[in-house]
Amino acid sequence: MLTSITGINWGDEGKGRMVDLLSQDYDIVARYQGGDNAGHTVKNERGKFVLNLIPSGILRPDVVCVMGGGMVIDPEHLEKEITSLTEKGVEISPKNLKISDRATITMPFHVAQDGLEEERLSKTGAQFGSTKRGIAYSYGDKYMKKTLRMGDLVHMDAGVRKRLETIVESKNLTMEKIYGQKPVSVDEMWAWCEKYSKLFAPYICDVGDYLDKADREGKKIMFEAQLGALRDIDFGIYPYTSSSNTVSAYAPIGAGIPGHKLNLSIGIMKAYSSCVGDGPFTTELAMTCLLYTSD
């Protein structure tokens, strides 16, 4: 049984709450796209939980959570998120959290470049309303084959070091020539990778194989989207979109089992629209109607 839960607005529809509610009937909850640029908020008897990267099913002890290969993951933010959850009594281990070896790493220079570019564009009013979490630059470098993946943290060898050197050399052309910044240090980036290699290597695996076996065993799998359909890079209001495919059809692909078919797709919306990030309000109503609906 493969089910997807996606937003059909601009995000902020309440998907996290619905995943938390429905996940009691599922064995696995998997995120398939996005990064830490939006949050799912869940309130229960233990308090309030804000989840940016980890699937909302983590709050249920019998649910295994998967972070799919379609995601871009900032290990620094993931560490903080895990710490915040464990401090509130949520148990997290490689048994109930599995990270795809194919997921792209959001590096510190991705976050820095995002902020610098948004600042540059804002001078002429051309900014996109980025959350400045490095998401677009992580995905951009993914498609240009100029970044590392989570699986590289498992094998921190000379080959990975060489790739990192090539990546940093290319990135420094942008950071120095366009933004006038100091060059990124390869040694600092390598030390950063080594830190998170030690922390997350036990969690990293072939989640496609794990999900395929689970499906064959009859386990119930829920795919949790981040943001909404109108933020989809292909089907959203371009260019005011996110940088990934948020629609339900992408769920099996981004999670790691592209040959599988969804049995159920659930769309979440709310009575009035709000959104994550900035951008034009393309369906804004006349003031008289707006005042009426806001009362």
Residues of each region from the PLM?
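Short acidic, glycine/serine/threonine-rich loops at helix termini
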Residues: 15-17, 40-44, 109-114, 143-145, ...
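Internal alpha/beta core interface subdomains
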Residues: 78, 82-210, 221
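Conserved small/polar residues in nucleotide/adenosyl-binding loops
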Residues: 292-295
